[in-house]
A protein has these predicted regions:
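Structural motif
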Residues: 52-55, 105-120
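Extracellular/periplasmic periplasmic-binding protein-like sensory domains
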Residues: 19, 47, 144-220, 232-233, ...
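Hydrophobic alpha-helical
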Residues: 1-6, 111-112, 118, 125-147, ...
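Extracytoplasmic ligand/sensor domains, especially the bilobed periplasmic-binding protein
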Residues: 1-104, 154-178
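Segments of small-molecule ligand-sensing domains
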Residues: 203-216, 227-295
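Extracytoplasmic "Venus flytrap"
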Residues: 72-84, 135, 187-190, 211-218
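Periplasmic-binding protein-like
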Residues: 10-16, 68-73, 124-134, 140, ...
Length: 314
């Protein structure tokens, strides 16, 4: 959608994707950083790979491991970005003293992860990470258990965002870890309604009879930003005026402050990206059944309260 808006000269605001795959994937030559150019109409707010790597390694540092890490990266935009030797996990893990065992890219919806599991067992892996779709992680985790492979830590992007995906694993989902973008305990409120994060989540659960999920905050923030932008333009049909208003945004939202001011970004992405805070958490099995997501590391965003410490998978 962002690519189409850019080509048509229509202002666009997007979210819920790490900024590197979003930005780099839309470039004419993703493999040539020197050719990357900013966009005229497409703007994005979310965290980046540098943030998820920091969150994961901060969580891992709470437990004693041999620093052997297994990588699970699919052959898609996210997997290729996360596993990239220049901008992904490999160089940063190496800097931090971890050894990454990467068996290579696999196809989404694979039904056999024997090669990956065998590579991890041979490499004495105690930590696994990656970015998987939920059915693939379910397949991998069930097969790993069948083959007697249980790492101390499993920090997986994308697959573990929703409670339903973890509940599908039964009791085997206990202490799986993931990045955490938004929760009811985040200390932010809506600029539209004044509702706190907890009030927004409670309202969603009351209306839908379903558990809250992380994207709720970001979807709400899209409406906050759109309303704020339209309040600041005298002609909402003028694409260039609307785009200028987007670029000038300075708004405290339910997911944190939004401003496209280039903070904590490389020069090539400074115009079009706004970073949002990220922390890490573990899914904990409740005595009553089901799971709670507990924030276990907030070093990257100390204003977001932690609810516990990392525990090993057993």
């Amino acid at each position: 959608v962002s690519t189409t808006c850019e080509s048509e000269g229509l202002p666009c605001i997007s979210t819920v994707a790490p900024w590197q795959p979003w930005f780099i994937g839309q470039q004419g030559n993703p493999g040539d950083p020197a050719s990357w150019k900013p966009f005229g109409y497409a703007y994005h707010f979310f965290w980046g790979l540098e943030d998820v790597i920091s969150v994961y390694t901060n969580m891992w540092a709470q437990l004693s491991t041999n620093k052997q890490v297994g990588g699970l990266f699919p052959n898609d935009g996210d997997g290729n970005a996360w596993g990239d030797g220049k901008v992904g996990f490999p160089p940063v893990l190496s800097e931090k003293g971890y050894k990454l065992i990467d068996p290579g890219r696999y196809q989404n919806l694979s039904d056999d992860f024997s090669a990956q599991i065998n590579a991890f067992k041979s490499g004495n892996v105690e930590v696994i990470t990656g970015v998987m779709i939920p059915p693939d992680f379910t397949t991998f985790w069930n097969q790993a258990k069948q083959k007697g492979f249980t790492p101390k830590i499993a920090s997986i992007g994308k697959a573990l965002l929703f409670p339903q995906a973890v509940e599908a694993l039964g009791k085997q989902g206990h202490n799986l870890s993931s990045e955490v973008w938004w929760t009811p305990s985040h200390p932010f409120k809506s600029s539209l309604t004044g509702a706190s994060s907890k009030e927004l989540a409670d309202g969603f659960m009351a209306a839908t009879k379903r558990p809250w999920t992380q994207p709720i905050g970001f979807v709400h923030a899209l409406f906050e930003i759109a309303a704020d932008v339209l309040k600041r333009v005298d002609d909402p049909t003028d694409a260039d005026k609307v785009t200028a208003a987007v670029a000038a945004t300075k708004l405290d939202t339910i997911v944190g402050p939004i401003a496209w001011n280039g903070a904590k970004l490389p020069p090539f992405a400074a115009k079009n990206i706004c970073k949002t805070p990220l922390v890490g958490g573990q899914w904990r099995l409740k005595d009553s059944g089901g799971y709670d997501l507990v924030i276990t590391d907030n070093k990257t965003a100390p204003n977001i309260p932690a609810g516990g410490k990392m525990e090993p998978i057993v």
